[in-house]
A protein has these predicted regions:
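Short glycine/proline- and aromatic-enriched beta-strand/turn motifs that initiate or cap beta-hairpins
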Residues: 22-75, 239
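Predominantly the C-terminal beta-signal and adjacent terminal strand-loop region
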Residues: 29, 178, 189-240
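Outer-membrane beta-barrel channels and translocator barrels
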Residues: 35, 85-87, 142-146, 192-194, ...
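Residues that define the transmembrane beta-barrel architecture of outer-membrane proteins
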Residues: 36-40, 72-76, 127-131, 147, ...
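Transmembrane beta-strands of outer-membrane beta-barrel proteins
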Residues: 38-44, 92-96, 131-133, 149-155, ...
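Transmembrane beta-strands of outer-membrane beta-barrel pores
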Residues: 46-50, 98-102, 155-163, 204-210, ...
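Repeated loop/turn-to-beta-strand initiation elements of outer-membrane beta-barrel proteins
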Residues: 50, 89-92, 145, 195-198
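Flexible, solvent-exposed loop segments that connect beta-strands
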Residues: 54-69, 102-128, 161-176, 211-225
Length: 240
């Protein structure tokens, strides 16, 4: 935990140093960049994901399971991007990403009166690797020297590449759907350096469809009516 905190602090200082350096720079780097009809880049980031669940009537009516809570862990994000100029202030961006190392968890507390042959505390882990395909519109501010901010809004389609894995399809496990759709919003800023543009970005994603593949006869699945995904992502874009 402390290592992660120190990494975040160091990252903030590094980004702040670059901002100061760019702001102090009199010479405007890559001054013709805004005239490009399109440009490409690469993305490296980290995401914090979680699941929002609605309990079913079965869970409320019965007490064989006392607690049922979903959770999820973060993962490393890598990808490519293509950005296209629409107007002076508007750009369209396609940013396909692979989210690696994440997992989704389901924690249960069973009622000992009805579950004498099972541990009271249960956890089901579903390894997850996701292909994310977001399409976004960027609203750019005016450029000040080598610095510019922007707002971002868009939609995305996610494909769970682990959905058909053996670990995800064991008998009795809760199952999630392969496809997920959502909306996104974010904020970022461009730091125009001598040979490339560094773009830190913070984005939130809100899944709109139910990703639970509900099985009424499976007690670990039947306690949920619906599950939706949520994500917060910090990214560094390296743009040409």
């Amino acid at each position: 935990m402390y290592n992660l905190l120190w990494k975040k602090i160091i990252l903030i200082f590094v980004v702040s140093f670059i901002v100061v350096e760019c702001s102090a720079q009199r010479e405007q780097y890559r001054s013709q960049h805004d005239d490009l009809p399109y440009y490409f880049g690469a993305t490296l980031g980290y995401n914090l994901s979680y699941l929002s669940a609605k309990k079913s009537e079965k869970f409320l009516a019965e007490d064989s399971i006392l607690v049922a809570e979903p959770a999820a862990s973060g993962g490393v994000t890598i990808g490519l991007q293509a950005t296209f100029k629409l107007t002076k202030r508007l750009q369209a961006r396609f940013n396909p990403l692979i989210v690696l190392g994440g997992a989704r968890y389901f924690n249960y507390t069973l009622n000992s009166k009805y579950n004498t042959n099972e541990p009271i505390e249960q956890r089901y882990t579903l390894p997850t690797t996701v292909l994310s395909l977001p399409v976004s519109i960027k609203f750019n501010s005016d450029r000040i020297d080598n610095f510019r901010t922007y707002l971002l809004f868009g939609v995305k389609a996610d494909v769970d590449l682990s959905a058909n894995s053996t670990a995800r399809n064991q008998e009795g496990y809760i199952k999630l759907k392969k496809y997920n759709y959502g909306v996104e919003a974010g904020v970022g800023f461009n730091l125009f350096l001598k040979f490339f543009t560094l773009t830190p970005e913070l984005k939130i994603s809100y899944g709109v469809n139910n990703i639970l593949d509900r099985e009424p006869n499976l007690k670990y699945s039947a306690v949920f009516e619906s599950i939706q995904s949520r994500m917060i992502m910090f990214s560094l874009h390296f743009e040409d």
